[in-house]
From Swiss-Prot:
Keywords: Cytoplasm, Ribosome biogenesis. Signal peptide: none annotated. HAMAP family: RbfA (MF_00003). One of several proteins that assist in the late maturation steps of the functional core of the 30S ribosomal subunit. Associates with free 30S ribosomal subunits (but not with 30S subunits that are part of 70S ribosomes or polysomes). Required for efficient processing of 16S rRNA. May interact with the 5'-terminal helix region of 16S rRNA. This is Ribosome-binding factor A. Its main location: cytoplasm.
Amino acid sequence: MTRPTSSAPSQRMLRVGEQVRAAITQVLQRGEVRDDIIEATVISISEVRMSPDLKIATAYVTPLGVSDHSIVIEALNRHAKFIRGRLGPQLRQMKYMPEVRFRDDTSFDNYKKIDELLRSPEVSRDLDSDSDSDEK
């Protein structure tokens, strides 16, 4: 008897993802990765999503102050095996050390687009007319 698959991550996947995110952040903050691109860039890790078997960790990163994110993400993926090895001391409780993959985090861009839409004259006009009708 199998359990139906769900698209939502389990509590364990969320907890392990947060632990992996914190461990990757520590590795990058300590400057353990010797790469000119990575050392010169401030990198924000917004989320780490784990596969259901906890063997693959996909880290969503945003390089700050860099116009071309792909260069930084390629550098991180080149050093993914080294970073995976450095996660060991912080994630001793895990049976398998997850393979780390880095992806560009586009959620900040989506938030920016939504904010621009909400501040557009058309939407603000509609919001003003709704508040005027509520007052009557």
